[in-house]
A protein has these predicted regions:
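Conserved PLP-enzyme active-site core in the AAT-like
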Residues: 1-160, 168
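A compositional/biophysical signature of low hydrophobicity enriched in polar/charged and small residues
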Residues: 156-180
Length: 180
């Protein structure tokens, strides 16, 4: 698997997801992208070839850091039966010999992730955490718009301040990643 962040933390490098996806797929492996920083509001990695997107829900999605969590989202486009993932193409004795690629097709990975994580480590939100996350998701689009507007205003102010030697913000036209 190839792992990347859409927007790296803390350096704010904007990853060329199309290039990463092309290279990963040329080798028969998926591109898994941490999309925590931009959220799905500002970047939809599947549109650039990513196969799996992950998000820390504790940050922007929650909005208040009141719960701890994360999500895994599968695009449903990757061929998990290509011979490189025996844990998906061979019988899983812990689930009565099921072969995930045969039973679930392109949803093999996300199904295995879900059933194994819930069974083995209980990776499931408590009801209150789910409620708090849902509250944050209801205002995510509006909050992200405001975050971006405010960040750009601050970056422009700092860029024009003679006491500041440089500003690294991808939305500034002077930033090398501005076009991505």
């Amino acid at each position: 698997c190839v792992f990347a962040e859409t927007l790296t933390n803390p350096s704010l490098v904007v990853t060329d997801l199309e290039l990463f996806a092309e290279r990963a797929h040329a080798h028969g492996v998926p591109l898994i992208v941490d999309n925590t920083f931009p959220t799905p509001v500002n970047c939809r990695p599947f549109e650039f070839g990513a196969d799996i997107a992950t998000h820390s829900t504790t940050k922007y999605m929650d909005g208040h850091a009141t719960q701890i969590g994360g999500v895994i989202v599968d695009s449903g486009h990757f061929d998990w039966a290509n011979g490189k993932f025996p844990m998906l193409t061979q019988p899983d004795e812990s689930y009565h010999g099921i072969v995930y690629t045969e039973a679930f097709g392109k949803a093999a990975y996300i199904t295995k992730a879900r059933v194994h994580l819930m069974r083995d480590i209980g990776a499931q939100a408590a009801p209150m955490n789910a409620f708090l996350l849902n509250l944050g998701l209801e205002t995510l689009a509006l909050r992200m718009q405001r975050h971006c507007e405010n960040a750009l205003a601050v970056a422009k102010y700092l860029e024009n301040n003679p006491k500041v030697s440089w500003v690294n913000y991808p939305c500034l036209p002077t930033n090398p990643y501005h076009e991505r």
